[in-house]
């Protein structure tokens, strides 16, 4: 019988911001002069204490990363996970995840994750994500063919984790590595469980083929159901058996209040934060990058893959050096 596991997650936001009418967006473009180091020091330690408390209460732990944003002060999730690997005792440690298309050294990712797995004595759950479109320019990478780069990077990491008879070379379309022979190797054999985020039914096939966990964020039932159904169908197609229940993961937003009235008030404020965090207000941030979305689903929504947001993506000052 499969037991449902519950993961505690906080995105480590920086809450002390100026009035909202004084800024366009709290992602990518908000000047870091607004981030007071002493305050950030306090917040980091507070968030680490909360994660450790979650471990003591029997919850598993999830961390993520984003870049140049007040919504998430963790630009390097492996560092936070390394701290938690030493400070916690029982919790499974999920990173969701490593933005592989934005990482030019997949072998480095394999090394970092293996190190965390060994320090934690095999408690790592390793997630891979494509990243979000508005962080592509900040990462100095082209968003084109992000899914292809993710899966090629994934293949190199898996090979690095599972090859134990000496160095190998890797020649891919996007990545080329020599003398790959990571130390240490993962604690878990053959490797830590892998999670992949998915935002549509069409992206579930490779996740199901590999038997990885498919995870969904910020989506209601009407969107989640067809994605989960597609994963189950693809898993059955590839493996000849039904997908275990623990192959599907969902991130929900939860607010707890002392009573119904307080809970409703807090939940409404939470929804306001999610909907008004100033991404949608800036065209160049909400833009769909070239190659980020397949033309087929865009056409099904009545959108042109060659117009609108694609032009916005390349407009200045998004790629400006000034």
PLM regions with names:
Residues 2, 8-35, 147-183, 223-322:
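An alpha-helical appendage that flanks or caps ligand/catalytic pockets
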Residues 47-51, 78-82, 110-114, 151-158, ...:
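Generic structural signal for well-ordered alpha-helices
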Residues 54, 65, 84, 116, ...:
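Conserved, mostly hydrophobic/aromatic
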Residues 197-223, 227-228:
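A conserved active-site cap/scaffold subdomain adjacent to cofactor or substrate pockets
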């Amino acid at each position: 019988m499969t037991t449902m596991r519950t993961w505690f997650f906080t995105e480590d936001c920086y809450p002390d911001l100026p009035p909202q009418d004084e800024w366009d967006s709290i992602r990518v473009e908000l000047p870091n002069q607004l981030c007071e180091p002493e305050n950030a020091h306090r917040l980091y330690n507070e968030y680490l204490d909360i994660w450790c408390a979650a471990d003591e209460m029997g919850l598993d732990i999830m961390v993520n990363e984003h870049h140049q944003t007040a919504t998430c002060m963790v630009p390097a999730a492996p560092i936070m996970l390394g701290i938690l690997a030493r400070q916690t005792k029982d919790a499974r440690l999920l990173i969701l995840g490593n933005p592989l298309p934005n990482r030019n050294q997949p072998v480095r990712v394999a090394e970092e994750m293996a190190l965390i797995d060994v320090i934690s004595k095999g408690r790592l759950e390793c997630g891979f994500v494509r990243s979000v479109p508005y962080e592509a320019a900040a990462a100095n990478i082209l968003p084109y063919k992000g899914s292809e780069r993710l899966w090629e990077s994934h293949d190199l990491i898996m090979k690095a984790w599972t090859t134990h008879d000496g160095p190998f070379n890797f020649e891919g379309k996007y990545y080329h590595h020599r003398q790959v022979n990571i130390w240490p190797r993962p604690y878990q054999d053959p490797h830590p469980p892998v999670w992949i985020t998915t935002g549509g039914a069409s992206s579930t096939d490779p996740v199901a083929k590999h038997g990885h966990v498919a995870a969904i964020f910020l989506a209601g039932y009407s969107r989640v159901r067809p994605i989960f159904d597609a994963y189950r169908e693809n898993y059955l197609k590839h493996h000849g058996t039904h997908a275990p229940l623990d192959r599907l993961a969902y991130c929900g937003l939860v607010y707890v209040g002392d009573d119904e009235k307080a809970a409703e008030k807090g939940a409404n404020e939470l929804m306001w934060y999610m909907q008004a965090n100033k991404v949608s207000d800036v065209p160049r941030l909400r833009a769909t990058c070239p190659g980020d979305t397949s033309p087929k689903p865009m056409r099904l929504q009545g959108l042109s893959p060659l117009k609108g947001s694609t032009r916005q993506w390349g407009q200045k000052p998004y790629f400006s050096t000034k």
